[in-house]
């Protein structure tokens, strides 16, 4: 076997292993949100399921976006955005803002109920479980294709409901049930569902 053939074989094995590992990460359930931003006559939104609370004091979140995307550029320029946490009734909204064929600019918001944020002006989705107004504090390159946007949560509002969840590459409505925790004093303590 030549060195170049061996390298190609290793690259194929590495790519296969990377696909397997990506499949395993799909077992991690995540909330689904739409990130929105605007700058004057320009507005954009995108569906994400890569959001996490990074710190409690100050309250900061992290959102992973594709490097060089239109939305990433808009947020870098304006430094503020809205994070709209979707309810289980908003799977069509998630699909819409994930559709690369949707109109660009403000027209993409013609098909959803939204209002302009009173301070920053960016669109916020009216039926979202939570609407968070965020200020970009840091942008960290991740690998070859993504950026981690770190943002401070400035204000927000919310409503009751069930979240839309991404699990194994599909959108789900889930019903949460609390767990019963058995006392730590019992040697056979376990946690079980009610």
Swiss-Prot record:
Q: Which Pfam families match?
A: Flavin_Reduct
Gene Ontology terms: biological process? antibiotic biosynthetic process
EC number of this enzyme: 1.5.1.38
**Catalytic activity of the protein:** FADH2 + NADP(+) = FAD + NADPH + 2 H(+); FMNH2 + NADP(+) = FMN + NADPH + 2 H(+)
Q: Which SUPFAM superfamilies match?
A: FMN-binding split barrel
Which top EC class is named for this enzyme in its record?
Answer: oxidoreductase
Spell out the SMART domains in the cross-references.
Flavin_Reduct
Sorted keywords for this record are: Antibiotic biosynthesis, FAD, Flavoprotein, FMN, NADP, Oxidoreductase
Which GO-annotated molecular functions does the record name? FMN binding; FMN reductase (NADPH) activity; riboflavin reductase (NADPH) activity
UniProt keyword Oxidoreductase, yes or no: yes
Q: So which domain of life are we looking at?
A: Bacteria
Matches recorded under Gene3D superfamilies: Electron Transport, Fmn-binding Protein, Chain A
According to its UniProt entry, what is the function of this protein? Involved in the biosynthesis of the azoxy antibiotic valanimycin, which has an antitumor activity. Catalyzes the reduction of FAD/FMN to FADH(2)/FMNH(2) which are subsequently used for the hydroxylation of isobutylamine by the isobutylamine N-hydroxylase VlmH. It can reduce either FAD or flavin mononucleotide (FMN) but prefers FAD. The enzyme has a strong preference for NADPH as acceptor.
Assembly notes: Homodimer. It can form an isobutylamine N-hydroxylase two component enzyme system formed of a flavin reductase component (VlmR) and a monooxygenase component (VlmH).
Record family assignment:
Belongs to the non-flavoprotein flavin reductase family.
Name this polypeptide is given: NADPH-flavin oxidoreductase
Protein source organism: Streptomyces viridifaciens
Per the record, the gene is vlmR
